[in-house]
A protein has these predicted regions:
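Charged, helix-rich terminal subdomains or tails
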Residues: 1-168
């Protein structure tokens, strides 16, 4: 949006530019999400699979929330991972690689409360945003009993978060 090394970035930070960026991001997330869930990607981008394609079936994903540049999904872990990789790739094409993309992905049992999933994955997203260069995804698995009982640990830290750049 504004080059980091610009000597006068305030000159470009106008209300109309922010409105255009906001509108473009809302359009992207409103229109593109459904297609990625169905594995319908722009020309030249093939869907990412951790395992082989399940006979062209749509991904087993439910959109709980999508607004602005935020998104909260639940579903099969391998489909969510494929979705995250595809969303990052399509987002990079859409923004010509000019914007970073941070995400948090958690693994939960089917009985885990969705409100708690949202809270912890939000913390994971913050870990990804706070990593050097931002352009990262925070993943996690079961934490140790020690970390779960530690009073000063965030929920994401208690669950043993691992942060990776999208290039790793």
């Amino acid at each position: 949006f504004i080059h980091k090394e610009n000597k006068n970035p305030e000159a470009y930070a106008t209300l109309s530019r922010y409105a255009a960026l906001s509108r473009s991001m809302a359009l992207f997330f409103r229109k593109i999400i459904k297609g990625i869930c169905k594995k319908e990607l722009p020309e030249g981008i093939k869907p990412f699979y951790l395992f082989e394609d399940k006979d062209g079936e749509p991904r087993k994903i439910h959109v709980v929330y999508s607004g602005g540049d935020d998104l909260f999904l639940v579903g099969a872990w391998d489909d969510l991972m494929g979705f995250a990789v595809d969303l990052k790739r399509v987002f990079s094409v859409y923004t010509n690689g000019k914007l970073t993309f941070s995400a948090g992905l958690g693994l939960y049992s089917s009985t885990y409360p969705i409100s708690r999933m949202a809270e912890v994955t939000g913390e994971l997203e913050e870990l990804a945003k706070n990593s050097p260069g931002k352009n990262s995804i925070a993943l996690f698995g079961s934490g140790t009993e020690y970390h779960r009982n530690e009073k000063n640990s965030s929920a994401a830290e208690k669950e043993n978060a691992a942060v990776y750049t999208w290039d790793e």
